[in-house]
Amino acid sequence: MLNLSDRGFVVDRAVFIPSIAFLLSTVGIVLLCPNASGSAFGTLQAAIVENASWFYGIVMAILLVASVVLAFSRVGNIRLGPDNSSPDYSLFSWLSMLFAAGVGIGLMFYGVAEPVVHYLRPPVGEGAPVGGENQAVNLTMLHWGFNAWSVYALMALVLAYFSFRRGLPLTLRSAFYPILGDRIYGPWGAAIDVFAIVCTTFGISTSLGLGVEQLSTGLNYLFGVPESGALKLAITVAIMAMAAVSVALGLDSGIKRLSEINSFLAIALLCFVLLIGPTALILGGTLENFGYYVANLITTSTNLFTYEDTEWLGGWTIFYWGWWISWAPFVGIFIARISRGRTIREFLIGVMVAPTLFVVLWMNVFGGSAIDLIHAGEVSFGEAVANDLSLIH
């Protein structure tokens, strides 16, 4: 192990070297053979959708049920840390960091686009169906709501428990301690951490790509900056630099403050759109759509369109389930790190309910406003969004 503790870093070569070798090899192959790589990834995705959709559905259902059961069982009273410990962060700071960790760029990118696409291009059939508004927003909330956060919650809970109650490292390998025992400190543990790093990198790449596309399109629209590979590279470098500075400043001085600023800005933007838009319609739609979402949660979560000839599932639900699962090691470690001192019940309710309620508000305010524009005759706006999601800036 390479010890750079004087600079705040400890590098485990058994994890770092295989991870960087695999990732660089993958990037190299994609750069050298972009068409073949794209075709291979497309074939793999199609095979997963055709043969493993049921597995994704079962896993997501089990995680959701397990989260609810644990939250309201006797183990909910266990504290993640010493029995007399208190939370490291205030409720607002904690929730702000949850929001920033799990849904930041994604909400900005999909808040308008996804409900519009589901409305104009529903899973089955063509055009905007009667009652399609409920279905469009409901599907969006399904992808960003309780199911997604149950993945993060359980991963973070396991890591927090073994780290703060058993004194194990705050890494994915610790989740396998009940199975592997002390072997987590050997090759098996290193392999698990390599897997976590690879999954995290793919998840971050997806989010970063969405943000870069959105910023690039926004700069082109507002200031006439030509969209190009150089522009996207510059945006990517800028985002990575800001992230690096935030991490270098530490959790309290960097990530915490940045998360709080993000939360204030997001809430301000949400309130602004709510007040200048069709406020009564948005609030009524929010209540109606949330009721529809909760009432149909089991049905929509397990609907794989098995008997329908549609490619919608692979492009949306299965894509999201895979995205959340790939993000889980990274987001889980971060959520565990900021949740020391909270009870399991408080932790699970906070991680699952608070972000989901914010998602419900966000998707209904922005998605509802966009669908109302389409009703008002702005069909070209809807078609533009459906054809190019990055137009939403």
Give residue ranges: language-model regions.
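Membrane-water interface regions at transmembrane-helix termini and the short interhelical loops
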Residues: 2-8, 34-48, 68-88, 136-143, ...
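Extracellular/periplasmic helix-exit of transmembrane alpha-helices
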Residues: 110-124, 273-297, 356-388
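N-terminal alpha-helical transmembrane segments of multi-pass membrane transport
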Residues: 1-132, 271, 275
